[in-house]
Structure formats: structure tokens, C-alpha cells
């Protein structure tokens, strides 16, 4: 206790983790760019609900709009800053909080995608840590309200994985594990980059598909052409990660090689993937929509270039062509530009070599 924590981005993941920290008595300040959300948090706090098994709670919180961040200059410097913004906002969010860090303070990327390098380019590698939130299924349905489309992961699934970029287990990584552990199961990892790429594979298999089809996670699972295309997306991303030397972890409760083989035409592996994904669907509300699908619905910019687009670019570096990821990236960008409307046929009628 006594550590000053700042969370830049009080959206679904930042709000969820931060609300639990506040509930546990930690000193947390939220900074967010959405005025209505900040105002609601100031007046009524944060409300956290779950689709199953967990009681609702509300906590009073301290929230600042980004334009009021300068108030931090009159206070004790921040010991820990969590950046929980969309990937395309990482640079400015890190720059914003950098000047308010304590000399031994550090920044934690609690985001999707691979943003540690961007953060390190601003504050230095020595002040950069990462934390993955795996299968957390949270969203922000209204100002001041965080909803999780499932229960807690608990012993069945470790949700948070905190680690140093160099892979050593340190007191800092253990401290982050303790803080996010208020929200759900957590562990310290010595394999941050492998964990990061594994989470990126999982996101690449669902986020962009939801964005361009307009379907929820449950609806995509019931659509065989889309379900198979998701496996191909994952297969390409896994091969890229392996080529870069990442030690991949389990992805969607499946061995990476099983997904990779399924995407390359192994029907036995495909049946294993289908069986596991249908089992997993019973633990999540059927109407849960992946975050990029939510962004598309709200008319917001997507992270497609930081997910499937990144897979394509990293594949090119090691001589791998990722046709499925390239096609999806193009379709999502066209939907973003309103050249196309979200439609499952964008995928079901797609023909690739």
C-alpha cells in the first residue's frame, strides 16, 4: 500500500482492473479522454457487473479528464502508470504520463497488441513492463459501467500475466501481478513476448472478423465458413510467431501447433479446435462482442493495423505471406471507411489461394 497508481485509459480493461484495485484500498487515479465517462466516475464512481457468478459492485473513484492531467504536477509523482488505451493512442498516452512519473516509476502496457516497444521509445526499456489480459471479455456499455461477459477465470484460467521485457522475475513484475490479481487470477511470466504474441493470435482470430461481419462471438462460432477462416488467421499468425522465435503459449485453450495444422488443412486438428471452442463458448455470454466489433458499432477507429496488419508486416520480415490476414485487414479498413457495410458474406464468399 502507499504506492501511487495512475491508469491512463479507464475503459473496459483499465476500468475493470482499476476498480478492483480501488476496492482493495489502493491509491488509484484514472485519466480518460471521454468527458461523459469521467464526469460519471466523478459523481457516481465505477459500477462493475458480470454476466454470471459474480455480484455487482460500485466504488467511488478519482477520475481526471486528459485536459486536467496537469493537476498531477502538484502531487506525489506516480510510482506505477498503467497504459490501457487503444494501441494507436499508446504514444501520446505514454508521453502524457511520463512527466509525472517518480524517478523509479515505471509504465505497464495493459493493452492488446505489441506496444511495449512504443512505450520504451518514450520512457526507456528500463521503465517498461507488460501485462496481458487473456480472455477477459469486458466492455464499457455506458459511462461509468464496466461489464464482463463471463464470470471470473479463477483457477480454471489465468487471466493476467505480468512480466518484464527481459524475462527475469523481479519485484516490479510481482507487484503488478499483485495489483491486477485483485480483479482475477494472475501470474508473473518470464515469457512476456511469447505471451504477447499468443494473445495477439487469439485476438487476430476474432476481433477483425466481428468488425467486418457485424457478428457476435457466438454467432461467428455457429458460422462454419467464418469459424474455419478464423482458424486460418490463427494458423498464419502462429507460423509468423514461430519464425520470429517466440515461445508460444496455449491459445484459446489449444496447443498452437493444433491451430496451425488445422489452418493448413488438417481435418483432425480442425475437429479438435472446433470441439474446444464450442466448450469454451459455454463459459461466455453468447451475445458478447469482441472489442473491435464494439469499436466498429460505435464508429470508432479499429486496431486492425496493430493486429492482423501487424501479422502481415511481421510475416514479410521472415518471408511468410499471410493471405488471410492481409485480406481481413483490407476488408476491415474498407468497412471503417464506409465503403462496405458489415456483412458475413465478406468472409463466407472470400476465395483465397
For each predicted feature, which ranges?
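NAD(P)+-binding Rossmann beta1-loop-alpha1 motif at the extreme N-terminus of oxidoreductases
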Residues: 1-54
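Internal alpha-helical scaffold of NAD(P)-dependent oxidoreductase catalytic cores
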Residues: 100, 122-125, 143-258
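Nucleotide donor/acceptor-binding cores
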Residues: 3-4, 79, 158
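NAD(P)-dependent Rossmann-like dehydrogenase/reductase catalytic/cofactor-binding core
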Residues: 2, 231-353
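Rossmann-like NAD(P)(H) cofactor-binding subdomain of soluble oxidoreductases
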Residues: 58-147
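Residues at the C-termini of beta-strands that transition into short coil/loop
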Residues: 32, 52, 65-67, 111, ...
Amino acid at each position: 500500500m502507499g504506492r501511487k497508481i495512475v491508469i491512463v485509459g479507464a475503459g473496459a480493461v483499465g476500468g475493470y482492473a482499476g476498480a478492483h484495485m480501488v476496492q482493495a484500498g489502493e491509491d488509484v487515479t484514472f485519466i480518460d479522454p471521454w468527458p461523459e465517462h469521467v464526469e460519471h466516475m466523478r459523481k457516481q464512481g465505477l459500477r462493475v457487473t458480470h454476466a454470471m457468478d459474480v455480484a455487482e459492485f460500485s466504488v467511488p473513484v478519482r477520475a481526471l479528464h486528459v485536459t486536467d492531467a496537469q493537476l498531477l504536477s502538484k502531487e506525489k509523482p506516480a510510482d506505477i502508470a498503467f497504459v490501457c488505451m487503444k494501441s494507436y493512442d499508446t504514444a501520446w498516452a505514454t508521453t502524457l504520463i511520463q512527466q509525472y512519473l517518480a524517478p523509479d516509476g515505471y509504465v505497464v502496457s495493459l493493452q492488446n497488441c505489441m506496444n511495449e516497444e512504443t512505450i520504451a521509445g518514450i520512457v526507456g526499456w528500463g521503465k517498461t513492463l507488460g501485462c496481458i489480459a487473456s480472455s477477459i471479455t469486458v466492455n464499457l456499455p455506458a459511462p461509468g459501467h464496466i461489464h464482463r461477459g463471463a464470470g471470473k477465470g479463477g483457477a480454471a484460467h489465468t487471466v493476467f500475466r505480468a512480466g518484464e521485457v527481459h524475462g527475469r522475475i523481479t519485484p516490479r513484475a510481482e507487484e503488478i501481478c499483485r495489483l491486477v490479481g485483485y480483479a482475477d487470477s494472475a501470474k508473473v511470466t518470464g515469457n512476456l513476448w511469447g505471451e504477447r504474441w499468443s494473445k495477439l493470435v487469439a485476438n487476430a482470430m476474432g476481433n477483425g472478423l466481428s468488425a467486418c461481419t457485424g457478428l457476435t462471438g457466438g454467432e461467428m462460432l455457429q458460422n462454419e465458413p467464418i469459424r474455419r477462416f478464423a482458424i486460418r488467421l490463427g494458423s498464419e499468425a502462429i507460423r509468423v510467431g514461430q519464425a520470429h522465435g517466440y515461445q508460444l503459449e496455449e491459445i484459446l485453450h489449444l496447443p498452437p501447433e493444433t491451430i496451425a495444422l488445422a489452418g493448413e488443412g488438417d481435418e483432425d486438428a480442425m475437429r479438435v479446435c472446433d470441439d474446444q471452442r464450442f466448450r469454451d463458448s459455454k463459459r461466455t455470454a453468447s451475445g458478447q462482442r469482441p472489442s473491435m466489433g464494439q469499436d466498429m458499432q460505435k464508429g470508432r477507429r479499429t486496431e486492425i493495423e496493430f493486429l492482423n496488419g501487424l501479422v502481415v508486416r511481421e510475416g514479410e520480415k521472415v518471408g511468410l505471406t499471410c493471405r488471410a490476414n492481409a485480406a481481413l485487414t483490407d476488408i476491415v479498413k474498407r468497412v471503417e471507411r464506409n465503403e462496405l457495410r458489415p456483412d458475413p458474406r465478406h468472409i463466407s464468399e472470400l476465395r483465397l489461394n
